[in-house]
Swiss-Prot record:
SUPFAM superfamilies membership: N-terminal nucleophile aminohydrolases (Ntn hydrolases), SIS domain
Top-level taxon of origin: Bacteria
Matching InterPro entries: GATase_2_dom (IPR017932), GFAT (IPR005855), GFAT_N (IPR047084), GlmS/AgaS_SIS (IPR035466), GlmS/FrlB_SIS (IPR035490), Ntn_hydrolases_N (IPR029055), SIS_dom (IPR001347), SIS_dom_sf (IPR046348)
Keywords: Aminotransferase, Cytoplasm, Glutamine amidotransferase, Repeat, Transferase
Assembly and binders: Homodimer.
Native organism: Staphylococcus epidermidis (strain ATCC 35984 / DSM 28319 / BCRC 17069 / CCUG 31568 / BM 3577 / RP62A)
Domain SIS: 284-423, 453-591
Every Glutamine amidotransferase type-2 domain range: 2-218
EC number: 2.6.1.16
Enzyme class (EC, first level): transferase
Catalytic site: C2 (nucleophile), K596 (for fru-6p isomerization activity)
GO BP, sorted A to Z: carbohydrate metabolic process; fructose 6-phosphate metabolic process; protein N-linked glycosylation; UDP-N-acetylglucosamine metabolic process
Compartments where located: Cytoplasm
Protein name according to UniProt: Glutamine--fructose-6-phosphate aminotransferase [isomerizing]
Length: 601
């Protein structure tokens, strides 16, 4: 959700900013803009829509500089248009600002300090830049004015400020929104994530909440709000820039679906010791083993992965587990056990709702574990422990390889805890994950069959239903989410046994119903549910597993361990959803109104 880049050095800032914004497209946005500073002042380029349109406008101008900031906006205050796009300037034109986040008290600040100011936008952001201008006119130096404003703000923010009277500085601050400082020789950068500015550096410094950062060409100075210098080490962003390119694929989503076998192999390698045994840091295992109940907190696809993880943890490790939607949990915390452990699942490690829960559970002193794809992310830094997905950059908004990686890591964690508890299981997990890897490869190779299924069942429909029982129900939720978010088909996932309690009333002639049948103990039951909907005119698509398949099934996945079937069956749904969106000529990688990383509550 939204993205910030900034550059100060000696090179062409305009081009570097545009390239940086292009790397942030995956986060989701509806407008974009940059500001570049030269001897003649600050030049703004802003456009509603795609960055390609912004580039056309910027490339048609000779204006350039060696200092600038850029922004992709996902509208929260005010509609997507030129006036509401970032960067924003103060009325005097002296100050220019980009901002991610939501300022909760902007109306109060506007009324108290800026009643005489004429605003050009509907945004909370413009209040910030006008306040800096206001306090500078009261005689405060820019850094002091900026700090004073930051102290007044309530809410989430990542800020990058330029002062036209000081062409050698970017002023930076953050709270609850991600922002990094990248360090180079003769230049420095700021970015919402490291991927944005890998073109310039892979050396970064973390910024903590409530800090002021003074970024110049040759120095980076970090202070707390009282002006005390804070020491901060530089770390290397372990990202291969080539991993963030589409390569031979038409879309990032298709590439990331095809990468899942390689991700499985990488996870097997990373979580295996030299003797071929599963390994996870002993401190993590001890904290998980000591817990009397586990609370998984997540959102969207990560929540669905958590539902599958609950099956592993309870059936293998024997630890009672609850799975909660982060945005609900933070406002309605349930009664907790005496020794809870919280597991936060987030591809980006920046999900605002999950972080809000983590802040509260940290206050209560509860142990926490983050499962994420991004080392050094906010959730990773603030939790007690982290398990990495090792999935590589996931650029498409619709998550695919992160989901399967999350499930794989949860399975490994559960098996190790089970062993720690003295619970013997009949699962050779590394061997079973290797079988899963081969099964995924088979499905990926069958992509033309998935395309045909999308054509046969979904090309003209406006609605679709996914049904399953037990663990297949959890996967049906993810299948429905994938389809709705990229094809815009109204899709819902249901427990097969719930059909007769209301949903079956929605079945009409030709309604596609995709059923999952990978669990032996409910195979007959889910097939009975499919007969119920067929009797009412539904168009059935049955996805089953070898050994449980029946004549007439639409597609049969290779046989794997029954608890690991989500890792395989979901790939069919990912591909079917991809082709359904493609057939409707939609933007598969950047669906409307959605953001990859939801960094505001």
């Amino acid at each position: 959700m939204c993205g910030i880049v900034g550059y100060i050095g000696y090179d062409n800032a305009k081009e570097l900013l545009l390239k940086g914004l292009e790397k942030l497209e995956y986060r989701g946005y509806d407008s974009a803009g940059i500001a570049v500073v030269n001897d003649d002042g600050t030049k703004l380029f802003k456009e509603k829509g795609r960055i390609a349109e912004l580039r056309k406008v910027a490339d048609n101008s000779d204006e350039d500089g060696t200092l600038g900031i850029g922004h992709t906006r996902w509208a929260t205050h005010g509609v997507p248009n030129y006036e509401n796009s970032h960067p924003h300037q103060s009325t005097s034109g002296r100050f220019t600002l980009v901002h991610n986040g939501v300022i909760e008290n902007y109306e109060e600040l506007k009324a108290e300090y800026l009643s005489d100011v004429t605003f050009s936008s509907e945004t909370d952001t413009e209040v910030i830049v006008q306040l800096v201008d206001y306090f500078s006119r009261q005689g405060l130096a820019t850094e002091d004015a900026f700090t004073k404003v930051v102290k007044l703000l309530h809410g989430s923010y990542a800020l990058g400020l330029l002062d036209d009277n000081d062409k050698d500085t970017i002023y930076v601050a953050k709270n609850k929104s991600p922002l990094l400082v990248g360090v180079g020789e003769g230049f420095n950068v700021i970015a919402s994530d490291a991927l944005a500015m890998l073109q310039t550096t892979n050396q970064y410094k973390e910024i903590h909440d409530h800090e002021i950062v003074i970024v110049k060409r040759d120095t980076v100075e970090i202070k707390d709000l009282e002006g005390h210098i804070q020491q901060r080490d530089t770390y290397t962003a372990e990202i291969d820039a080539a991993d963030a390119e589409k390569g031979v694929y038409d879309h990032y989503m298709l590439k990331e679906i095809h990468e899942q076998p390689a991700v499985m192999r990488r996870i097997i390698q990373e979580y295996q010791d030299e003797k071929g045994n599963l390994k996870i840091d002993s401190e993590i295992i001890n904290d998980v083993a000591d817990a009397d109940r586990i609370y998984i907190v997540a959102a969207g696809t990560s929540y669905h992965a958590g539902l599958v993880g609950k099956e592993f943890i309870e059936k293998w490790a024997g630890v009672p587990t609850e799975v909660h939607v982060a945005s609900e949990f933070v406002y309605n915390m349930p009664l907790l056990s005496e020794k809870p452990l919280f597991i936060y699942i987030s591809q980006s490690g920046e999900t605002a709702d999950s972080r809000a829960v983590l802040v509260e559970t940290n206050k209560l002193g509860h142990k926490s574990l983050t499962i994420t794809n991004v080392a050094g992310s906010t959730l990773s830094r603030e939790a007690d422990h982290t398990l990495l997905l090792h999935a590589g950059p996931e650029i498409a908004v619709a998550s695919t390889k992160a989901y399967t990686a999350q499930i794989a890591v949860l399975s490994i964690l559960s098996q190790i805890v089970a062993k720690n508890h003295g619970r013997e299981t009949d699962v050779d997990l590394l061997r079973e994950l290797a079988k899963v890897t081969t099964a995924i490869e088979t499905i990926v190779d069958d992509a033309p069959k998935m395309e045909q299924i999308a054509t046969d069942f979904l090309k003209t429909t406006r609605n679709a239903f996914f049904i399953g029982r037990t663990i297949d129900y959890n996967v049906s939720l993810e299948g429905a989410l994938k389809l709705k978010e990229i094809s815009y088909i109204q899709a819902e996932g249901f427990a097969g046994g719930e059909l007769k309690h209301g949903t079956i009333a929605l079945i009409e002639d030709g309604t596609p119903v995709i059923g999952l049948a990978t669990q032996e103990n409910v195979n007959l039951s889910i097939r009975g549910n499919m007969k119920e909907v067929v009797a009412r005119g539904a168009y059935p698509c049955m996805i089953s597993m070898e050994g449980l398949n029946k004549e007439g099934d639409t597609y049969v996945i290779p046989q794997v361990h029954e608890l690991l079937t989500p890792l395989v069956s979901v790939v069919t749904m990912q591909l079917i959803s991809y082709y359904a969106a493609l057939q409707r000529d939609l933007d598969v990688d950047k669906p409307r109104n959605l953001a990859k990383s939801v960094t505001v509550e």
